[in-house]
Amino acid sequence: HKEEELLGSSGGPPPEEPPKEGNPAEINVERDEKLIKVLDKLLLYLRIVHSLDYYNTCEYPNEDEMPNRCGIIHVRGPMPPNRISHGEVLEWQKTFEEKLTPLLSVRESLSEEEAQKMGRKDTEQEVEKFVTSNTQELGKDKWLCPLSGKKFKGPEFVRKHIFNKHAEKIEEVKKEVAFFNNFLTDAKRPALPEMKPAQPPGPAQILPPGLTPGLPYPHQTPQGLMPYGQPALPIFGYGAGAVRPAVPTGGPPYPHGPYGAGRGNYDAFRGQGGYPGKPRNRMVRGDPRAIVEYRDLDAPDDVDFF
């Protein structure tokens, strides 16, 4: 009965009619395990050699800078649980090919003139260099082939010996030349970025440590903008004499007087005479790591002790 049902000659369901125009047919997605293994090898080759992630339709141009090289690869999604229409398959193929076309298109290589300027090698010349470097003169009518250690009466015999007995060495030279030329003419060859020399900062750009352009006062600078390991600078004039840069800058240290840069001393930021209009804050302390300075108890009380 099953055969009759398949043939449609018996009481089974009628044979399926071909889809009418405008109604796409539904199809089942099938998997071929042998073809999938071949496909996976090709996709892995694209990923490892060309940094091309096929299923994500993207390329990783700066893979050498990534934490884990070849650490990202997208794989096939799960099989669709339901039957899909033929139109959906065609639409998916069209969209996928449009995304892959820019990645798989052949890029222009260097012209012969540009390649010559960049050091393109000639196969025949490189072979001649190899033969010449392996033809050593020991004395009159005595020549040596260092590849085999045999001696000959003339350089022409050494040359013939190399081509006959060491043909594999000649092929290695040709392969090296082809590899070098292919690398040279590859528009996507890896190369170090061009480093532009940094312009020395002008006088107006030199700021004390902890000061950021656009933020004139240290107490207005967010702590997140301070260099790592460097304490926040105090408010102008209060404990400034005890501040030292966390990293040596090569310049002279901040000037400090015998009384901790009080009102009568020169301050590196505000000049002499104090910062007008700001009330003194007795709770603000200087750098806790500052050097303990000697204070003369007989000296006039010029600073506030806290």
From Swiss-Prot:
**Key words of the record:** Activator, Cytoplasm, Methylation, Nucleus, Phosphoprotein, RNA-mediated gene silencing, Transcription, Transcription regulation
Region: Disordered; residue ranges are: 1-28, 251-284
Q: Give the modified residues of type Phosphoserine.
A: 109
Query: Know the name of this protein?
Result: Serrate RNA effector molecule homolog
| Any one GO MF annotation of this record | DNA binding
Quaternary structure annotation from Swiss-Prot or TrEMBL? Interacts with CASP8AP2, ERBB4, NCBP1/CBP80 and DROSHA. Interacts with LUZP4. Interacts with NCBP2/CBP20 and NCBP3.
**Which family does the similarity line name?**
Belongs to the ARS2 family.
Give the highest taxon in the source lineage.
Eukaryota
What's the source species for this entry?
Answer: Cricetulus griseus (Chinese hamster)
Q: Where are the transmembrane segments?
A: none
What gene is this protein translated from? SRRT
Could you tell me the Gene Ontology terms of the biological process aspect for this record?
Answer: neuronal stem cell population maintenance; primary miRNA processing; regulation of DNA-templated transcription
Which Gene Ontology terms of cellular component type are present?
cytoplasm; nuclear body; nucleoplasm
Residues bearing PTM Phosphothreonine: 101
Q: Which PANTHER family match?
A: ARSENITE-RESISTANCE PROTEIN 2, SERRATE RNA EFFECTOR MOLECULE HOMOLOG
Read off the lineage from the record. Answer: Eukaryota, Metazoa, Chordata, Craniata, Vertebrata
InterPro entries in UniProt? SE/Ars2, SERRATE/Ars2_C
